[in-house]
Amino acid sequence: MGFLVDTQKEGGGHSWGYVRSLVRRKQVDSANGQSHGHQLARALTVPHLVAIGVGATIGAGVYILVGTVAREHSGPSLALSFLIAGIAAGLSAFCYAELSSRCPSAGSAYHYSYICVGEGVAWIIGWALILEYTIGGSAVARGISPNLALIFGGEDGLPAILARHQIPGLDIVVDPCAAILVFVVTGLLCMGIKESTFAQGIVTAVNVCVLLFVIVAGSYLGFKTGWPGYELPTGFFPFGVDGMFAGSATVFFAFIGFDSVASTAEEVRNPQRDLPIGIGLALLLCCSLYMMVSIVIVGLIPYYAMDPDTPISSAFASHDMQWAVYLITLGAVMALCSALMGALLPQPRILMAMARDGLLPSIFSDINKRTQVPVKATVATGLCAATLAFFMDVSQLAGMVSVGTLLAFTMVAISVLILRYVPPDEQPLPSSLQERIDSVSFICGETTSSGHVGTSDSSHQPLIVNNDALVDVPLIKNQEALGCLVLSEETRRIVAGWSIMFTCVGAFLLSYAASSLSFPGLIRYPLCGVGGCLLLAGLIALSSIDQDDARHTFGHSGGYMCPFVPLLPIICILINMYLLVNLGSATWARVSVWLLIGVIVYVFYGRKNSSLANAVYVTTAHAEEIYREHEGSLA
């Protein structure tokens, strides 16, 4: 098909059409991209982004995790556990920084997956993130009233409107406080991004000040008492180095939240500069606070004597500072409020991005003309989260939050590899330009066998190309269809595509085998070997070939570029897959039900209403020419 990207096959029917729809990809938003009507307000700068990142990341978990992880895993080496977890989270942050600056549009990991991988994977990521933010926001809201009760001297001291109540005859405990707070935060978010971010900044500042008080006052007590927590016969690693790493895997989830910054990319004044800085500063500040609090608390009291529920408060109480308990509890409440804002902020933007692409009803894509935020999507998000928070104790579902985040982290790292080695070089054009496309095709001396170019259902790029057949997975064009790629370039892209596939499969096999301790050695060790070999082969191959020249110009050029590619994204993929396979079968069973619902919604609504359903794919080199011809004809 000449310059047109076409892998039309005879036969296959509807089943083949379903497969093709899964791999169609959209372009990075540009001047030629589709108009979205009213736009989001570009009002955010670096301080706003840091406030969003820190507020969404530092929840009340730090006030609890310190005691739990120190008692069960790391002991006095807790600060090192936080450091290792922070470095692991930083790998994902590097990947987010590059993609958010190159593709600065709402939707975060969903948006990047749609551009680099395909519609099917993007839908799964977006659907999983919807679950993550809904349950995450509800769980955070349910945790506020117990902390408020500590300030009021117990649950009996809480006003009736804030206290929990059990419905007579039913095993349901309603939480009015949680629902009220969700509605308050929803109202703030509807007022505008700048107003809601200002409020989050204030709440986050109070939380950070409380943590700084813990660090300063705790250090004073530590030097005064001689740091008894470090003078133990069990040493610095009472559970061994393995315990320290086990602690790192647990506290890694305390760093989840910085990805909320990427969801606001469309509202940042200078995304190419500010997004990488905002993500990096937020993660650095969170890691520093976590480590300093850990150093102080495990030094004030022996790790085995820590209260697993209120480790910081009990540590100060043991040194006759009962009044500090109220201040620390206030910090925990502020942390929960900030985390609630961080959970409810990204979801409307993901709903908006999916609705823009036609995968969800268009009502979610409406942007209020005055406040310049997706008010309808925000209200829908708030209603769902408030209902769950009011009626359900979602603490048992908290593990499902991690699935969405880790899937997003993994896909962002894979997207960086794709962008660097096999970036998409086709663009979807509206079918209204079919006549102009045919005209340019004729001028270029191209001929087609059918007289019309394929639509998106028949036009995508295959990952692996040989002389006999096309394996239809997106990423790479075949040379016959292009007629302009030399063999060496085609070979490079084929090798890169295979290598990325080997890397992902190897990381999964290695993670699964290493985590399956119940497997017989005859199965487990060979599986580890196969996975390790595939992973290493992919890494060596990607390190040995050149990256694609388009990596400098793909998307919005001039932004941040992730260092140490391909090593850094591959390590990121391995870490996230290891954490995913260790979430437990019960968590995966619950998530599978949600994903199955998502598949049904996509098959019966999203696939048919996708904005790419009737798109025509052409190579980037000819897309601009087609647009110029079209604009010239309108002049």
Curated annotation (Swiss-Prot):
Where, in residue ranges, is this chain on the Vacuolar side? 70-76, 132-171, 222-235, 302-324, 398, 515-524, 582-585
List the GO terms this entry assigns under cellular component, sorted alphabetically.
Answer: plant-type vacuole; plant-type vacuole membrane
Q: Where in the cell is it found?
A: Vacuole membrane
- Main localisation: membrane
InterPro entries in alphabetical order: AA/rel_permease1 (IPR002293), CAT_C (IPR029485)
Membrane spanning segments where? 49-69, 77-97, 109-131, 172-192, 201-221, 236-256, 281-301, 325-345, 377-397, 399-419, 494-514, 525-545, 561-581, 586-606
Query: Which controlled-vocabulary keywords does the entry list?
Result: Amino-acid transport, Membrane, Transmembrane, Transmembrane helix, Transport, Vacuole
Q: Which residues lie on this side of the membrane: Cytoplasmic?
A: 1-48, 98-108, 193-200, 257-280, 346-376, 420-493, 546-560, 607-635
Q: Which cysteines are joined by disulfide bonds?
A: none
Functional summary from the UniProt entry: Permease involved in the transport of the cationic amino acids.
Q: What is this protein called?
A: Cationic amino acid transporter 2, vacuolar
- Provide the species name: Arabidopsis thaliana
Gene for this protein? CAT2
